[in-house]
Amino acid sequence: MSFDLAARLAARRAEHLYRQRPLLQSPQGPQVVVDGQPLLAFCNNDYLGLANHPQVIEAWRSGASRWGVGGGASHLVIGHSTPHHALEEALAELTGRPRALLFTTGYMANLGAVTALVGQGDTVLEDRLNHASLLDAGLLSGARFNRYLHNDAHSLAKRLEKATGNTLVVTDGVFSMDGDVADLPALARATKARGAWLMVDDAHGFGPLGANGGGLVEHFGLGLDEVPVLVGTLGKAFGTAGAFVAGSEDLIESLIQFARPYIYTTSQPPALACATLKSLELLRSEHWRREHLAALIRQFRQGAEQIGLQLMDSFTPIQPILVGDSARAVRLSQMLRERGIMVSAIRPPTVPAGSARLRVTLSAAHSEAQVQLLLSALADCFRELQAEPSHA
């Protein structure tokens, strides 16, 4: 018996679900070159426009000159350098928590935290729309795994009644495909009432949300008691790469001892930590970035509603336009690209069947004029698609 990979690939093509990697031939930013074509992009997660910031680039360059290029070893051997330590202290300060721990990727942070905290005989409860890394972590933990209805504290409470052992409730802060936010106060109340812990992956909230860019937990004014485990990524609003878990002294020490994705991997380049420290400095000093981004979000939503587009409930930089049919979403993405604008079509299995969408993401690096160009192109494309015979 052999693996029939060709048949699997053919089936995916037939369902309009086949994915290909665009080749980026320029730095990240609103104006990019993809597969040789200049495009105005609305599909990256560089929410504050820091990925190509000259000061961040210089911090990386000078960090490489001082500390070299590679991490060289795992953190527990000889890979934990002074820049790593300084970044962990800065992230602890940003989150208002005693400690923070660096991970190489967001996927590894989620996998490491969940599997270190729960196992056989325990329970992990997750929002049904959580990121794949969180769902995988729950499944791989060995704990009893169950999902509650999306953003539904009542559904969570019913499942908490049946939980056994140490119980970890896990949710995204901002849901990456819908752009809506978790009702953290309600989830925290339900979780705390049953003596469970709440873990929040705020990958898309850090930077854009909160009074100081501290994310959704800061937005709601929640502390360590309500959210004992807080995860963030550095490759989105901070414009670099990596991730972290923030929490109590005991939590971080436990992760150092028991989180296998932390223990058994080489540390990130020290120069990368230098660059991220500069990003954090810019987050504190350049408040206009968050203010400008908020204005662009308002501009886009008002314009999209005037066109009659079906938006989702989001006040974040993630602004999905619900299309429904996968082939139609791909067609709209292609039509936009023909007009020099890049917006990704998101299809199953990333989103539920029948809910394909265009996923617009906005950045502080965009201008009001660029957002208006996007709105005009969307109006033209939707009007043109409706006039085509197959969609009339």
Swiss-Prot record:
GO terms for molecular function: 8-amino-7-oxononanoate synthase activity; pyridoxal phosphate binding. It is an enzyme of class 2 (transferase). It holds the Pfam family Aminotran_1_2. SUPFAM superfamilies: PLP-dependent transferases (SSF53383). It catalyses: 6-carboxyhexanoyl-[ACP] + L-alanine + H(+) = (8S)-8-amino-7-oxononanoate + holo-[ACP] + CO2. The keyword Transferase applies. Its EC number is 2.3.1.47. Pyridoxal 5'-phosphate binds at G106, Y107, S176, H204, T233. Pathway: Cofactor biosynthesis; biotin biosynthesis. The modification N6-(pyridoxal phosphate)lysine is found at K236. One of its GO terms (biological process) is biotin biosynthetic process. The keyword Transferase applies. InterPro entries: Aminotrans_II_pyridoxalP_BS (IPR001917), Aminotransferase_I/II_large (IPR004839), AON_synthase_class-II (IPR050087), AONS_Archaea/Proteobacteria (IPR004723), AONS_Proteobacteria (IPR022834), PyrdxlP-dep_Trfase (IPR015424), PyrdxlP-dep_Trfase_major (IPR015421), PyrdxlP-dep_Trfase_small (IPR015422). Substrate binds at R19, H131, T350. Transmembrane segments: none annotated. Keywords: Biotin biosynthesis, Pyridoxal phosphate, Transferase. Its cofactor is pyridoxal 5'-phosphate. PROSITE patterns: AA_TRANSFER_CLASS_2. CDD domains: KBL_like. Homodimer. Belongs to the class-II pyridoxal-phosphate-dependent aminotransferase family. BioF subfamily. Catalyzes the decarboxylative condensation of pimeloyl-[acyl-carrier protein] and L-alanine to produce 8-amino-7-oxononanoate (AON), [acyl-carrier protein], and carbon dioxide. This is 8-amino-7-oxononanoate synthase. It comes from Pseudomonas fluorescens (strain ATCC BAA-477 / NRRL B-23932 / Pf-5).
